[in-house]
């Protein structure tokens, strides 16, 4: 049986890439565009400047699928796009004022979280639900480790926890679980493709 799927570190490295550099750039750009799309799934909350968005799910998926370096690069590109004025942040936000505003820490946390999740994915944590949800849960915590202290500079520590951490925990668990289902499912599909190819080659 082919062992290609076990040798690949991440899903993005699983498929043949004759033009590796171009493929890397394409994947990094695609990750930033996914983030931009998920950022528009934003629900503002009356008690906090931090909206509920699909961004954190995007961070987990991009980091897990692209790996540490490409995942972090994709998040950096996303931040650059927003800082340059492209409406890629939550609810079409853009510009340095958003990037360095009250929820800017969460945005910078995306880079670190994608790197951490990617690093764990490169070590096989994205292959099963149990290990994947641990990796993605850690990724969520990394985002809050950046976001909450940053928000505290604007509103104080207690209010930062009330407005920028506790209300988002249930959603964080759901997103980590969703990513924990999607990435192992993608690997299962890859393994099935390998089996089909092996059968065809016999």
Where do the model's predicted regions map?
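Helix-loop junctions at the membrane-solvent interface of multi-pass transporters
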Residues: 37, 41, 65, 91-92, ...
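Short helix-perturbing small/polar motifs within transmembrane alpha-helices
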Residues: 3-16, 23, 37, 96-143
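Hydrophobic transmembrane alpha-helices
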Residues: 2-72
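Helix-boundary and loop/linker segments of multi-pass membrane transporters
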Residues: 16-21, 49-50, 90-91, 96, ...
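Alpha-helical membrane segments and adjacent membrane-interface helices in multi-pass membrane proteins
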Residues: 41-116
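Generic alpha-helical transmembrane segments of integral inner-membrane proteins
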Residues: 29, 33, 37, 61, ...
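Hydrophobic alpha-helical transmembrane segments
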Residues: 25-30, 57-61, 72-77, 103, ...
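Membrane-embedded alpha-helical hairpins and interfacial helices in multi-pass inner-membrane proteins
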Residues: 48, 120, 124-202
